[in-house]
Amino acid sequence: MAENGKNCDQRRIAMSKDQHNGSLTDPSSVHEKKRRDREERQNIVLWRQPLITLQYFSLETLVVLKEWTSKLWHRQSIVVSFLLLLAALVATYYVEGAHQQYVQRIEKQFLLYAYWIGLGILSSVGLGTGLHTFLLYLGPHIASVTLAAYECNSVNFPEPPYPDQIICPEEEGAEGAISLWSIISKVRIEACMWGIGTAIGELPPYFMARAARLSGAEPDDEEYQEFEEMLEHAEAAQDFASRAKLAVQKLVQKVGFFGILACASIPNPLFDLAGITCGHFLVPFWTFFGATLIGKAIIKMHIQKIFVIVTFSKHIVEQMVTFIGAVPGIGPSLQKPFQEYLEAQRQKLHHRSEAGTPQGENWLSWMFEKLVVAMVCYFVLSIINSMAQNYAKRIQQRLNSEEKTK
């Protein structure tokens, strides 16, 4: 493994020497070398170079731990204050007394908020490929509440076990008592907390670009470097992706708060560029974060909630199952597992999971569980690849700086 890493380093040194003797000062040569370095880093993935990837991942982990240890060491007063606060909270949590009823209530709400905020941060913070937690967690939760609300004619699910498990209340509501607004209100906390998490996850690109602009230093971030290149070659942009990025940049720069609000409210993959743009042009923090928070946690979240609730409303689901059954040839065989799944969910809601249909696992549930596991595993693999590529970039930058000093 060490020999593979050494050979990889030697290839980089050879490439650097080939481009030395003044050629690196030429802008086209610099751009070409950056492209080659980027392509070389992109090849450092587990399925192509597993040993080097794991080695670089381990070394990058040690570097990051060392950096954070150094930062915490230079902020000893903050660390000590945090530890004292934590000790006081632990003592309050474990000491018996009349306050325990409030402690339990606060603990329940804190864990609920932390869970959904954490999932929101994972969705947008930019670790690896990003974990699509709306599709994996929040969307299915809203769909489950919607199906249960129409089946029970109520959203007053017993707590506990809600939200871990949904069962119908003893006194079910009248037929037609469920409205779109009642379901929206039921899942408002979870959805808003998830939206707040996604807004928090958009802060790193903003802070990175702002710090780079104030210090005048070039940050160690490819997205920011691409952003600067895009600004330099704005007139020559021809492809759709470049023109879309420029449109987002101009909207945010010229319109300000409402431009950021519009970008945050509409689902789009280019919002990271809005954060970089705001940081680069020194947009005030509360202007950026306020617009992002309102857009993601309120406007965008309600759009997504309404879409899921309407899609999984009772009559729409029944029409979808009927439509599947109408497919020539394979319709009935495809329709059966959907009907079995819906029937099993109804029995669970009415406390009848032990009777009626057999409890063999439905293949729809099995497929979704395996999909969740696969996406989480891919997310972890992407983090390993990303950290390994970060370490490779450190090596390339060190070699480039050594070449410049020769």
UniProtKB/Swiss-Prot annotation:
It comes from the Eukaryota. The VTT domain was previously called the SNARE-assoc domain. As there is no evidence that this domain associates with SNARE proteins, it was renamed as VMP1, TMEM41, and TVP38 (VTT) domain. The chain crosses the membrane at residues 78-98, 110-130, 251-271, 274-294, 306-326, 364-384. GO terms for molecular function: phospholipid scramblase activity. Residues 1-20 have a biased composition (Basic and acidic residues). Residues 2-77, 131-250, 295-305, 385-406 are cytoplasmic. It is found in: Endoplasmic reticulum-Golgi intermediate compartment membrane; Cell membrane; Vacuole membrane; Endoplasmic reticulum membrane. Keywords: Acetylation, Autophagy, Cell adhesion, Cell membrane, Endoplasmic reticulum, Lipid transport, Membrane, Transmembrane, Transmembrane helix, Transport, Vacuole. Residues 99-109, 272-273, 327-363 are extracellular. Disulfide bonds: none annotated. This is Vacuole membrane protein 1. It is a multi-pass membrane protein. One of its GO terms (cellular component) is plasma membrane. Interacts with BECN1. Interacts with TJP1. Interacts with TP53INP2. Interacts with TMEM41B. Interacts with ATP2A2, PLN and SLN; competes with PLN and SLN to prevent them from forming an inhibitory complex with ATP2A2. Interacts with ATG2A. Residues 173-316 are annotated as: VTT domain. It comes from Mus musculus (Mouse). The keyword Transmembrane helix applies.
